[in-house]
């Protein structure tokens, strides 16, 4: 219970609350949550995608590679990078592995590659189905890659990754319940009411349990895996996080800017 000092007006309380909500890096944008004994950081973007951006290269045509450089670039424009995370898997030169659209410009085409059978474990990006998160005229959506391509969508921003975690409220059937293949993982979901929600595990988790987080806890009928292990980094200064990639940097990066 909070006791108010005599003389503090209701108007002053309302003003203080408004100012608190307007603070950059506010903690209600990202928070720590626990689901089935696994700890996560959950971040919410605005339903219409306002403030959500994709970053890859700076004005010198060089990959940003880390969150601090994006935060510095935002600050130079008088803006604040509230949170950021890896936006999907990438090549050794930090280029996106699949479709990448930034500010309406397609900088990388969609990947339709299927690995040759018997050539070893299938990389996560190519596990079926992989998918595309995009922001278009009708808002944000996540679709399996083949469905996205058939619809010939022209998005404002888009990134391709894989595999899909949840498809039309069903967990991807390739995932194994109780799998011992556990690592830190990151993903994005389109959730109840059209909310855009990001999740990064702070503990090791398998694919099935990570997908279950999106479907059952975050209420996301469609969700996409972004990256795992050293690639599952996040920037949330309000929570004391500014991760560094184990791979020398990140490729495409989601950033929420105010």
Where in this protein do the model-derived segments appear?
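Active-site-adjacent helix-turn-beta-strand microarchitecture at beta-sheet edges
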Residues: 95-175
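Conserved, well-ordered active-site substructure
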Residues: 97-113, 118-119, 174-223, 231-258
């Amino acid at each position: 219970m909070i006791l108010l000092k005599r003389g503090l007006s209701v108007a002053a309380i309302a003003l203080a609350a408004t100012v608190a909500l307007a603070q950059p890096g506010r903690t209600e944008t990202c928070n720590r949550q626990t689901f089935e004994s696994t700890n996560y950081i959950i971040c919410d973007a605005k339903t219409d995608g306002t403030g959500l951006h994709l970053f890859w290269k700076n004005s010198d045509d060089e990959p940003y590679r880390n969150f601090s450089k994006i935060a510095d670039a935002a600050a130079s424009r008088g803006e604040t990078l509230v949170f950021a995370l890896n936006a999907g898997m990438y090549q050794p030169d930090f280029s996106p592995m699949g479709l990448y659209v930034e500010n309406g410009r397609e900088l990388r085409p969609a990947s339709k590659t299927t690995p040759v059978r018997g050539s070893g474990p299938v990389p996560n990006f190519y596990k079926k189905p992989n998918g595309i998160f995009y922001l278009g005229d009708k808002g944000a959506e996540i679709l399996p890659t083949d469905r996205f391509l058939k619809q010939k969508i022209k998005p404002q921003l888009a990134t391709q990754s894989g595999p899909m975690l949840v498809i039309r409220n069903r967990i991807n059937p390739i995932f194994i319940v109780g799998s011992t293949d556990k690592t830190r993982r990151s993903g994005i979901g389109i959730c109840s009411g059209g909310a855009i929600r990001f999740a990064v595990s702070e503990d090791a988790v398998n694919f099935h349990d990570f997908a279950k987080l999106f479907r059952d806890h975050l209420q996301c009928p469609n969700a996409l895996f972004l990256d795992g292990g050293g690639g599952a980094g996040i920037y949330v200064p309000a929570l004391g996080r500014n991760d560094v990639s184990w791979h020398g940097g990140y490729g495409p990066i989601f950033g929420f800017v105010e």
